[in-house]
């Protein structure tokens, strides 16, 4: 059985655990760097990206997470997690992990649209996935080898680059586990 970690520093941790378990995989909440060796793939959840970054610095996660990526292990960033994975963030000089060749903009759907749901067609996942957007970022641009998986109102809201998967919305907040299953399948492929 594959083991999927959820970075447990801040954000929607419990909901991701529930979704992973609903897909028949084992979930591990990651609170210590040493735990990264126990898992096959990692979800970086939604929350608040600057707070998450502060905690990642405090607990020494930045370099170990980059090493985890260098080992070829899949990583899935949702909402704030997407921002953590991105190589460029609009209005910021430095990225967080800078692993995925995308540029993201924070809170890009505007204050008046703080949260909403939208039906999405996600390539390889579903034609009718309900995305829950909460102060969501979006992907402004992608590198040449990044596959755009979904758009909403002409904005990129899900993408994949090899072992990296990212989305603007919160797939863990509904009972539709197909996006989580897609990531688990990515992890299984790397183990084969």
Swiss-Prot record:
What does this gene product do?
Catalyzes the hydrolysis of glutamine to glutamate and ammonia as part of the biosynthesis of pyridoxal 5'-phosphate. The resulting ammonia molecule is channeled to the active site of PdxS.
Q: Where is the signal peptide?
A: none
Catalytic residues of the enzyme: 79, 170, 172
Annotated PROSITE patterns:
PDXT_SNO_1, PDXT_SNO_2
Q: In which pathway does it act?
A: Cofactor biosynthesis; pyridoxal 5'-phosphate biosynthesis
Organism name = Anoxybacillus flavithermus (strain DSM 21510 / WK1)
Reactions the enzyme catalyzes: aldehydo-D-ribose 5-phosphate + D-glyceraldehyde 3-phosphate + L-glutamine = pyridoxal 5'-phosphate + L-glutamate + phosphate + 3 H2O + H(+); L-glutamine + H2O = L-glutamate + NH4(+)
Tell me which domain of life the UniProt entry assigns to the organism this sequence originates from: Bacteria
Subunit composition?
In the presence of PdxS, forms a dodecamer of heterodimers. Only shows activity in the heterodimer.
Keyword Metal-binding attached:
no
Per UniProt, L-glutamine binds at: 47-49, 106, 134-135
Q: What is its EC number?
A: 4.3.3.6, 3.5.1.2
- Cellular component terms per the entry's GO annotation: cytosol; glutaminase complex
One GO MF term on file is: pyridoxal 5'-phosphate synthase (glutamine hydrolysing) activity
Gene, per the UniProt record = pdxT
Does the keyword section mention Hydrolase? yes
Any idea what this protein is called? Pyridoxal 5'-phosphate synthase subunit PdxT
Sorted UniProt keywords? Glutamine amidotransferase, Hydrolase, Lyase, Pyridoxal phosphate
Its GO biological process terms? Answer: glutamine catabolic process; pyridoxal phosphate biosynthetic process; pyridoxine metabolic process
UniProt lists the family membership as follows: Belongs to the glutaminase PdxT/SNO family.
Question: What Pfam families does the record point to?
Answer: SNO
Read off the NCBIfam families from this record.
Answer: PLP_synth_Pdx2 (TIGR03800)
